Amino acid sequence: MIELIVRGARRRVFVRVSGSGPALLLMHGFPASSFEWAELEPELARRHTVVAFDFLGYGATEKPADHRYSIFEQADLVEALLAKLEIQDPSVVAYDYGAIVATELVARAVKTFTITRCVLLNHGLYARLYRPRPIQKLTLVPGIGRLLAYALNERLFIRSWGEVFSDSHPLDPAVAALHYRALRTGAPGRDIHRRLLRYIPERAANRERLETAMATTEVPLSFLWGMQDPVSGAAIATELRRDRPDVDLVEYADAGHCPHIEAPDRVAADIIARTAPARP
């Protein structure tokens, strides 16, 4: 756990650093934590200094009470984290929620560090093609959302998350339970899930800024995509190939929304092929 100053407030942030070599920053998705990278980290750490952390409100990081969570604040947190660790040229691997934050960092073109390469996994790259789950939509409805948030127990959490995994690689309930408990631990109320979901309308409201950043950036981009994803799968991959015929896109035909959890060995190998210097 380290302490960072984010927007003038002191925040306790869970960070895990392993391995040696060029810096590789891992940015997790909703509704999980940095633990979702656990199966990949040992292999990645053979070639990289791997930095995995929990966003504000997630996992073991601080969950401030009555807080209005924002992808822009999370980007501020990443900037503060890299400054604290004195990392100036990381490669970034980002998934889902983390990929939206990574896109904001690309849009900022910050001067304090340079993203060497950005490897993005399934996320709402094109807002118009993003398909949130029904329970997510309902959770965002005033009144109903608060009731649903309070009703979200471990069983419902596991069932809802499991719906976005492929039939070939189903969600392990024991792993999902760990993420559920991490989300609840330290939360000042039972509606943390609802508060964090604010990223969906925030992403939609900033669609032009974020999509323009991806279309115009000079940062090298790679995409690792689970094609069985009902949220942000084949339709987004198809649109990506249409927009960028020369795109570096790896398609996992048998994986759903979470390819790094469903096929960690393949995803780790594909990350290393793009981020680690070739061995002599």
Region spans (language model):
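Active-site loop/oxyanion-hole signature of alpha/beta-hydrolase fold enzymes
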Residues: 6-9, 16-18, 52-94, 125, ...
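Conserved catalytic-core motifs of eukaryotic protein kinase domains, centered on the activation segment
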Residues: 36-38, 61-67, 130-131, 234-235
